[in-house]
Amino acid sequence: GDIPEPPDASGNFAQPFTFSDEKQLFAAARGEYDLTGSVTAWIGGGFREGEEENDLSNPRVAADGSASAFRFVNTREDSVRSIDAGLRAEFETGAIGHSVVTSGTFVDLESKNAFAFSNFGGFSTGTLSNPVAVTAPATDAFIGGDLANPLVTETSENASFAIADTLSFAQGRLLATAGLRYQNIKTQSFNATSGDLTSGYDAGKVTPAFGLVWKASSQISLYGNYAENLQPGATAPNVSGGVPVTNGGEILDPFTGEQVEVGLKYDGGDFGGTLSVFSVNRPNGIVENQVFSADGEQRNQGIELSIFGEPITGFRVLGGATVLDNQLEKTQDGINEGNTSIGTPEFQGNINLEYDVAAIPGLTVDGRVVHTGKQFTDAANTIAVEDWTRLDLGVRYALEVNQTPVTLRARLENVTNNDYWASVGGFPGANYLILGNPRTFSLSASADF
């Protein structure tokens, strides 16, 4: 069907019973110690404890504009622990300089989940522009676990050890880096109701990384790099497109990703920029006949430009643009082979400008323009959301209050009050449309103590 027109972003088409409540407690610490003048050791660690409770009812829009929905309730608890440590040593062998780094990391995750759905046939909610409120239906059609006491549904242990040496030639004008990294990913998934093990794997791999930097002058550098990494397999959703997935919660096999980049960097002190071409691949998943499975990979090849700095005193610029060729490759039976993956624009760009008003010391005005190209909403590439452009304006004033630096800010986002679909996403087959924010005015103040 056709993409529905975006509704008035200042309105609210959500059902009155819906809510999302999330709490996160996290902390991190890191320290370094110079063992000698050329050897440094470091260690860091952190944790995150999260709790989440949702009662959702996202509308589905038909070709005639009518909307329907079903109710989805879930609770989630996450516990994450991480630690990393390493050594960095610098020395020379003849005319060649070395910077050797060895490091190790470990990340442990335990996730508890429970969910419940109402009848997937759904209920009428009017239209996006004229929503109709309904009484919350019972969530007894598809249940996984106890919402008040969710069981462990996923555990993951990611460990890695890496060593790399950056060699310096020609008085530091040529830098060459070579490294190896061993990764081990151990993941298990469990049934949300019974707690029984449903799938998992324990896989390890050594992957390489290489890089070159040539400092053509004090301002211009040419660089190139290649790296591989082991990525965790995707987890099958429990529901996709309003239909239960028969292997929901199953974890797919890990994927070896590759990244290649070649670029040029200019740094003139006050002003600079980079221009690069790159190629990155990532796994692709598909839901077909209610089964989630791996379906080849997404190949992203593109050109990226970024600029930064103060080309004129009092006038600053920060921006960038990316042109992306995204294609699905190695798909099952050639389905959607060569198509663009869901929610991937061919062009994205933004530019931020700031100007210090000389007549009023401390006063700065700024503007930002953001543009995103069209995005397909289905893997067959038959329908897409239109491209969009947003203008933001702001002003800030820096002053001192009792010798304390204070900055006052005012900002107007989406100056033209455009209604637009900002992005497309979700699990395969879900095809979520994300509505952009309406015109929004904000005030803030900050102080440095």
What are the residue ranges of the model-derived segments?
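Acidic/polar loop-and-plug regions of large Gram-negative outer-membrane beta-barrel proteins
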Residues: G1-D34, F47-D78, G122-P150, N158
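Outer-membrane beta-barrel signature, preferentially recognizing the C-terminal barrel domain
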Residues: I3-G31, V152-S156, E228-E310, I342-F347, ...
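Residue-level signature of outer-membrane beta-barrel architecture
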Residues: Y33, A89-F91, T166-F169, G204, ...
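Repeated loop/turn-to-beta-strand initiation elements of outer-membrane beta-barrel proteins
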Residues: S38-A41, A95, G172-A176, Q219-L222, ...
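Transmembrane beta-barrel strands of outer-membrane/channel proteins
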Residues: I43-E49, T102-D108, A178-Y182, L222-E228, ...
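Structural signature of Gram-negative outer-membrane beta-barrels, strongest in the C-terminal barrel
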Residues: D78, G97-L109, V152-R282, E310
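Conserved C-terminal beta-signal and adjacent last beta-strands/turns
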Residues: V100, G224, V260, I342-F449
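Gram-negative outer-membrane beta-barrel transporters
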Residues: G272, V277-N281, S293-A379, S446-D448
